[in-house]
Curated annotation (Swiss-Prot):
Record-level Gene Ontology MF annotations: magnesium ion binding
Classification via SMART domains: MR_MLE
Positions of Mg(2+) binding: D205, E231, E257
Keywords of this entry: Magnesium, Metal-binding
Protein name stated in the entry: D-galactonate dehydratase family member VIC002985
Pfam families (UniProt xref): MR_MLE_C, MR_MLE_N
Species, as recorded: Vibrio coralliilyticus (strain ATCC BAA-450 / DSM 19607 / CCUG 48437 / LMG 20984 / YB1)
Length: 399
């Protein structure tokens, strides 16, 4: 095989709609260009600095064909490893290298992996409203579009606060009440099953908003409504409590969007404490570790439901689809409709058809970035209030 030398590495940050999006572009001596997602929307400048100041000089002159070696080198070169900044930066490069290899092979990415194990991947989307009437309207709309898996949320994460009993002059933050959230969410499940029966699979994201003992009770309360899975019922530092949940309920659990380090998921998979792995592909370092994780999960009967939120480039979402049509144990793909500006910046962004996503058949990933259009949407940053989630007494809680 002829060498393909890396000649330049770019990091483009843009905000076409609500979220800061980060793309890495790798250039080579034969003109083949690769694109990858490196989005860590809460810290975009940190990722750009990592790529521009540290990874770029490390990579220029290297052979782009040696993806495994380059991934290992990038991960250990700083000695400290497996954090969200370095992992996303490495991911952007890693995806771009796979994109280059697939383009040079003149095949879509999933064929480079070994081909398809399914025609398309089932999709779930988000129905969210502050009222049941609004939630019904959203669900009805998605059912008409062909969705048969819908994540249902009554209000933002933590629910709709009602008459919060806060302190005098409360600290700035996003307040919620755990007891109200649990009561309202269990009622939501009940009403949805009464209205729709089994017309669609219900998913729900707890988003770590409960204490572990509350999470155990919540899982027991919603079990009879047969959710497809409950997402992030516990934070990564409290996963030992999964044994308590497993021993008391059969509710399906999806976990992993905050994971960065293999030690966070290894024992959960081997001991079958979860049903679905929810890792965010760029947060774990890209395609190279995602393939390994997917195969590990298959060995232990754990299915794949990658985290695929709107704060991810359509490049990253397309990578998820390629992984999902290839990996035999892939179950479902999260999807939120792209807005017009995002589509302009990322030509080729895909949309579901009748509740399924189909992988691009173009060579490579199939989605790129228009850097000229991206420049029209500069990144803006302000401290996020929603990640300053607080209980009524002012205690900060995992967001």
């Amino acid at each position: 095989m002829n060498t393909t030398i890396i000649t330049d590495v770019e990091c483009i940050i843009t905000k076409p709609d609500r979220h800061n999006l980060i793309t890495v572009i790798v250039h080579t001596n034969n003109g083949t260009v690769g694109y990858g997602c490196a989005t860590f929307q809460q810290r975009p400048l940190a990722v750009k600095t990592m790529v521009d100041e540290y990874l770029k000089p490390l990579l220029i002159g290297k052979d782009a064909n040696n993806i495994e070696d380059l991934w290992q080198m990038m991960m250990v070169n700083a000695y400290w490893r497996n954090g969200p900044v370095i992992n996303n930066a490495v991911s952007g490069v890693d995806m771009a290298l796979w994109d280059i290899k697939a383009k040079q092979a003149k095949m879509p990415l999933h064929q480079l992996f070994g081909g398809k194990s399914r025609d398309a991947i089932a999709v779930y989307t988000h129905a969210t409203s502050d009222s049941m009437e609004g939630l019904y309207e959203s669900i009805d709309n998605y059912l008409k579009q062909g969705y048969r898996h819908i994540r249902c949320q009554l209000g933002f994460y933590g629910g709709v606060p009602e008459a919060l009993h806060t302190t005098q002059n409360p600290t700035v933050g996003s307040y919620y009440d755990q007891d109200q959230y649990v009561e309202n969410t269990v009622t939501m499940f009940k009403l949805l099953r009464e209205k729709y029966g089994n017309q669609f699979h219900i998913l729900h994201d707890v988003h770590e908003r409960l204490f572990p003992n509350q999470a155990v009770q919540f899982a027991k309360d919603v079990e009879k409504y047969k959710p497809y899975f409950i997402e992030d019922i516990l934070p990564p530092n409290q996963t030992e409590w999964l044994d308590n949940i497993r021993s008391q309920t059969s509710v399906s659990l999806g976990l992993g969007e905050l994971f960065n380090n293999p030690e966070e998921w290894k024992s959960l998979i081997i001991n079958r404490r979860i049903d679905f792995i929810r890792c965010h592909v760029s947060q774990i370092g890209g395609i190279t570790p995602a393939l390994k994780l997917g195969h590990l999960c298959q060995t232990f009967g754990v299915r794949i439901a990658w985290h695929c939120p709107p704060d991810m480039t359509p490049i990253g979402a397309a990578v998820n689809t390629h992984l999902n049509v290839h990996l035999h144990n892939a179950a479902i793909q999260e999807h939120v409709e792209y807005k017009e500006n995002t589509r302009k910046v990322f030509p080729g962004a895909s949309e579901p058809k009748n509740g399924y996503l189909y992988a691009s058949e173009l060579s490579g990933i199939g989605v790129e970035i228009d850097t000229e259009v991206a420049a029209d949407f500069p990144v803006t940053y302000r401290p996020h209030e929603w990640t300053q989630s607080r209980l009524p007494d002012g205690t900060i809680h995992t967001p």
